[in-house]
């Protein structure tokens, strides 16, 4: 695989993931041609991809931290050391032996302390290059054809207000647009997925496609109201959860009622509470809870529950050794389970957990 091909693959993955997660959109389908069902064009796809064109692509593992994030106390100590060093250096120029020797030694000591302080400062990664790469529309998605139109970062043209300004747009502009009141999808997509967690199905049945291939919401006015409530609450998820679970709809019995069996056999209109399957992690958690083994400790490292010996022997790129967690920590909630992408823990695989090769909003359970 050529480096340029990797760049195209990474860009396409970012477009697919970002558009699906936040917009419930299949913008990734417009990589090689205009979208067949929704009004996304190839130009929309590559303009969206251009938001990520200033990310440094190492291609050889995680880069080292390159941005210091000192605490207030560390900043204060560093400033004090710098001031003392500069003061001593000015005195060295006028001093004579043996005082000069003592001053030089003191400067060396303070400099060593300063270096130690710098090593104690936490670092984060600023994966932004100085010069964004040129982004072109690739005919049929062919990375070898560099004759296409050069595009700048931008959002899909049909989605209302443009972000055009007298400068190159950044990912911060994209983020602000995604959570703005003007955005037609983000809040609706979010509350629809939250609704599914408590009612078994979304107000719109397809969680990862809000286009023509998705499902029309059964209660569009309710979906709009919840979306506005989410925005006006300051995107307060706890508020939305509370709102849903104290509703009369949520507190209904899941037992079928004679009067609704014929009018709403599939519970499409939420005439009763749903009975729905739970995810693989929750099946494990429930089994551990029933046996009295579940550890409810919050936080900490990921865990590696028992799995058959040699299970990883078929895993390539690179070979890995699985070391089962010891003690009660292996019984922590499924939230903390180690995930080996494309090679799931057997228990997760048995109950249809996703492989995480691609972003999934709705599991096939």
Each model region followed by its residue ranges:
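Active-site Gly/Thr loop motif
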Residues: 333, 340-352
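Sequence context surrounding c-type heme c attachment/ligation sites in exported
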Residues: 1-79, 348
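Hydrophobic alpha-helical segments
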Residues: 55-58, 342, 354
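Generic recognition of well-ordered alpha-helical segments
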Residues: 17, 24, 28, 47-54, ...
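A broadly conserved detector of short glycine/acidic/proline-rich loop/turn motifs that flank catalytic sites
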Residues: 52, 141, 294, 339-341
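Extracytoplasmic/periplasmic beta-strand context in beta-sandwich domains
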Residues: 44-46, 268, 333
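Primarily short, surface-exposed interaction patches in extracytoplasmic proteins
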Residues: 8-11, 39, 76-329, 348, ...
């Amino acid at each position: 695989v050529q480096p340029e091909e990797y760049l195209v693959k990474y860009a396409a993955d970012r477009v697919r993931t970002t558009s699906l997660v936040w917009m419930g959109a299949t913008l990734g389908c417009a990589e090689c041609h205009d979208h067949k069902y929704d009004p996304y064009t190839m130009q929309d796809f590559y303009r969206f991809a251009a938001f990520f064109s200033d990310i440094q692509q190492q291609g050889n593992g995680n880069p080292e931290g390159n941005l210091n994030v000192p605490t207030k106390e560390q900043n204060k100590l560093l400033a004090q050391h710098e001031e003392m060093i500069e003061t001593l250096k000015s005195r060295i120029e006028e001093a004579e032996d043996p005082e000069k020797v003592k001053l030089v030694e003191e400067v060396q000591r303070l400099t060593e302390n300063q270096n130690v302080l710098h090593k104690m400062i936490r670092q984060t990664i600023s994966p932004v290059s100085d010069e964004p790469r040129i982004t072109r529309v690739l005919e049929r998605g062919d990375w070898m054809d560099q004759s296409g139109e050069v595009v700048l970062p931008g959002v899909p043209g049909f989605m209302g207000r443009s972000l055009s300004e007298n400068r190159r747009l950044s990912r911060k502009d994209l983020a602000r647009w995604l959570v703005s009141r003007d955005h037609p999808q983000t809040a609706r997509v979010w509350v629809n997925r939250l609704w599914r967690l408590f009612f078994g199905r979304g107000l719109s049945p397809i969680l990862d496609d809000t286009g023509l291939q998705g499902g029309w919401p059964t209660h569009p006015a309710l979906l709009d109201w919840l979306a506005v409530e989410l925005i006006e609450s300051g995107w307060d998820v706890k508020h939305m959860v509370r709102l849903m679970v104290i509703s009369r709809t949520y507190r209904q019995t899941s037992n079928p009622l004679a009067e609704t069996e014929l009018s709403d056999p599939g519970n499409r209109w939420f005439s009763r509470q749903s009975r729905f399957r739970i995810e693989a992690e929750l099946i494990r958690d429930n089994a551990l809870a029933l046996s009295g083994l579940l550890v409810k400790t919050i936080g900490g490292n990921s865990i590696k529950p028992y799995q058959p010996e040699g299970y990883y022997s078929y895993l390539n790129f690179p070979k890995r050794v699985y070391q089962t967690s010891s003690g009660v920590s292996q019984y922590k909630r499924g939230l903390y389970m180690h995930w080996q992408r494309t090679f799931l823990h057997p228990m997760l695989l048995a109950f249809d957990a996703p492989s995480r090769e691609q972003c999934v909003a709705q599991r096939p359970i």
